[in-house]
Amino acid sequence: MQTIEIGNKAELQACKFLHTQELEILAHNFKALPYGEIDIIALDKDTLVFIEVKYRSKTKFAQAEEMLTYSKQQKLVNSASIYLQHNPQYQDYQCRFDLIAINESNINWIKNAFGVI
């Protein structure tokens, strides 16, 4: 399976999981050039959640949770800013950055995976 297909499958699995947790999916693979994309944007009651999905099929060398680098965090923050510029109806919402880490077949949802000053 190609890397993109694996990523899409993991993101679909994450979306299904988030639906079971009663989050409303607003966007999937939101492109925010030049920074990249946000895997999933969702509403958790009155909080706007920007979600990065990381998948590892083998955890011998690293867990999916370890793959969210500082550089990626900065790209997510910048991408979230662009999303808010394009969607002013969410400007007054609380925002949160979460990580969905999928290791083999286990899903770990880390709320507030990193903070923003």
UniProtKB/Swiss-Prot annotation:
Pfam families: UPF0102 (PF02021)
A GO molecular-function descriptor: nucleic acid binding
InterPro entries hit by this protein: Restrct_endonuc-II-like, tRNA_endonuc-like_dom_sf, UPF0102_YraN-like
NCBIfam families per the UniProt record, alphabetical: PRK12497.1-3, PRK14682.1, YraN family protein
Family indicated by similarity: Belongs to the UPF0102 family.
Full protein name: UPF0102 protein FTN_0424
Organism field: Francisella tularensis subsp. novicida (strain U112)
Lineage: Bacteria, Pseudomonadati, Pseudomonadota, Gammaproteobacteria, Thiotrichales
